[in-house]
Swiss-Prot record:
Part of the 50S ribosomal subunit; part of the 5S rRNA/L5/L18/L25 subcomplex. Contacts the 5S rRNA. Binds to the 5S rRNA independently of L5 and L18. The keyword Ribonucleoprotein applies. Residues 197-208 have a biased composition (Acidic residues). PANTHER family: RIBOSOMAL PROTEIN L25/GLN-TRNA SYNTHETASE, ANTI-CODON-BINDING DOMAIN-CONTAINING PROTEIN, RIBOSOMAL PROTEIN L25_GLN-TRNA SYNTHETASE, ANTI-CODON-BINDING DOMAIN-CONTAINING PROTEIN. GO terms for biological process: translation. HAMAP family: Ribosomal_bL25, Ribosomal_bL25_CTC. Disulfide bonds: none annotated. This is Large ribosomal subunit protein bL25. It comes from Psychrobacter sp. (strain PRwf-1). The gene is rplY. Belongs to the bacterial ribosomal protein bL25 family. CTC subfamily. Coiled coil: none annotated. Pfam families: Ribosomal_L25p, Ribosomal_TL5_C. Signal peptide: none annotated. Keywords: Ribonucleoprotein, Ribosomal protein, RNA-binding, rRNA-binding.
Amino acid sequence: MSDILYTVNGITRTNDQQGKGASRRLRKQNLVPAIIYGGNEEPTAIAIKKNELWKLLENEAFFSNILTINLEGEEHLAVIKDLQRHPSKGFAMHADFQRIVKGQKINMQIPLHFTGREEAPGIKAGGILSTLVTDIEIVCLPSNLPEFLEVDVSNLEIGESLHLTDIKLPEGVVIFELDVDEPVDRTVVNMQAPTVEEVDTDAEEVDAADVPATEQGSEEDKGE
C-alpha cells in the first residue's frame, strides 16, 4: 500500500440532517450525504462538499486507496465501498465508506491495467485485443492493498486468452472468486482474429427493375 494520498473533509450530520428529505436539502446546499461504518463502531452519518468530492472522484486511484476522512479534526482511515450517482447527470448523490481496522482483511474492487499491447504478436498480426474484465474483487490486509493489478498481454497470440489465475498478485493478495469453495476462473482478456468484412451481397446483386427488359420469346413475336 502506498502512502495515503487522499483526504476527505466532512462534517458530522445531526439527527435532523438524516433521512430522504434531509438528504435532498443537503444536496441543495451542495453537500453530498455519506456514511462511515464498520470497525466495531456505530455508523456515522456525514456530509461532504460536492465540489471537493467531485475532484477526488476524477482520480481512479481514489477508489482503491485508503483514505483519511477528516471529521472536524478527528481522522478516520477508510475506503470507499459504494457511490450512488445521478442517473443522467453523473454527480455523486451518496457515498459509503468503510472504516479500516489494523490486522483485519478487507474486500475491494481493484482496476486492471493491461500492458504490452503493442508488443503482442497477435496485435502485430492484425488481431484485436478484447478485454472482458476491467476490475476484480480482491481480499487482503489494508497494508497490502494495491492501487491496481497489472495484466501483461505482450505474449498473446491470436486465439489465446488470459484468465484470473494468470494475473500476478502481490504478496498477501488473493482474488475473491478464486478463494471460494467453487472458484470460477473467468477469462479476463483474449486475442481475437481480425474480422473479415463481409461482402455486401445486396449491393452486388443487380436490381432487376434497373435492367432494361430484353426481348423474350422473340421467335414467338416474329410468328405473330
